[in-house]
Amino acid sequence: METQHKRPKLTAEEIRRLPNLLQVVNRFNKLTNDFVSNGGWSSVDAEPVPNDYCWHAPSMDFHNNAEDDKFIVVQTMKGRHTLKPNLMRRPFLFRGEKKDHGMIISSFTQENFDKEKQLRSREEAWERHLVANLKSEEFIALLKTHPLFMMLDRGIILQPEKRPVFINMNYYGLAQHYGFRTGLVDFSPDIMAAAFFACTKNLGNDRYEPITDMGQNPYGVIYVHKINPLLTFKIAGFSTIGLQLYPRTGAQKGFFFNEGVTPVNVNQIVAPIYFRQDANVSRHIYKEMKDGKALFPDDTISKYASQILADSEVSGETFAHNLYSNQEDFDRNLEVARKHGVSINWHKMPYFTPEMLHELEQDLKNGLWEQFCNQIYFADEKKGKAMFESLLNLPKNPAYSHYFIAGEYERITAYDADMHRRAGRKRI
C-alpha cells in the first residue's frame, strides 16, 4: 500500500458545524432517490443490457427486475458465479468508521502499528502478519470441509442448464466477516450498514453498543465511492462478497477492496463525509439495526470462528499451506508462531466434526437452505424460474441429497481423505 498523508484533525468549531449521522444518511437517501427518478443506470454511461438477456450476464446486477433485497446471479470472468447485491437502485458504496483515522487501512495493515499508533519494525509487522494468516487459513480450511460449501464449489446442475454452475465461495471474504485480520476493506451499498459501524463500539463476539461518549468520539466519517459500472469492479479494485450460504455477508450486502492485490489506493477513490457524533442518533441507528442483529444474524460458523481465534494451536496442514503460499523458511516460521503463542499440531486436520454436522442438520431443519435460496435472483424469467426451483429442490435431488445428510459426510470427503493418505505415503 503506497504512502498516504493523513488528513489533519478537525477543530472543535469545525466539528460543531458538522451534520449528525442521520442527516448524512438522509442526504444520501435523497441522492439515491434522485438517481432512480432520473433513470438510474440507463441515464449514465454504463454497460449495455445484453441483447439476449442472458440469466448470468456481467451487467445483471445493474439491469434486472428483482426486488432490492435480492442477490443477482452474475458470471465472473473466470466462469464462476457470484451472488451480488442488487445495484439496480444503488449508485454508491459506503464504509463507516467511528473515528477519523486520516485514511482507510485494512485490519491486516493495522498490525503495522502499535497501540500508540507508532510504526512497528518490518520484522515485527511481518511476524504479526504470519500469525494473522495462520488463523484465517485455519478457518478457511475448516470451511472448505463444510458439505454444502463443497457441493457449491464442485458445481451443481440446475435445470434446464446442461453445464454446471459454480457458486463462488469467497473464503477470504468470509474470514474477514467473521473477525479475522485480512487485507480486505469492507464496503456496502446499504448506507445504514455503514452508519451502524460508524456510531457503535465493537465489544467483541459480534456484540456492539451505541457510542455515547462524545468526548472520546467527537466525530466520525462515512467514506463514499460513487459506482461506475465500467470502472468500479474492473479497474478500481472493488469485488463482491455478496450472499454466501450463511446470512451474515448477505445481511451486510458485502463488497470489499483488497489492499494486497490492487494497485489503486482506496483512499484515492472515495470521498470522506464527516459527521458529528450524537448519542441520541447513535441509539436510534442501533435500535433500527436491531442492536446489530440485522447485520450479525445468529449462525453456527461464528462460533467456530471464535474458537479458532481463541485457540493456541493451528493444524500442520494450515502451517504447511501458509509456508507454500509465502515461500518462507520452515524453521523461521515455526519459531515465530511459537513466539506468539501458537503451537503447530501436526496430527490435526480441520474438518467438520460429528457435533458440527449435527448443528448443520439443525440449521437445515430451521430453514437455512430455503433462506439462502429465497434471496437469489436468476434473470431470464422463464429459465430463471426453473433454475431457482432446481436450486431450492437440491436436497431432494438424488445427485446432491447426500450433501445434506450428516451420515453421508465420510463418503463426501472420501476422495480428499484418500489424497491425504497418498500424500502421507509419499512423504514416508
Question: PLM features: what roles do these ranges have?
Answer:
Residues 1-428:
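Catalytic-core elements of nucleic-acid end-processing and repair enzymes
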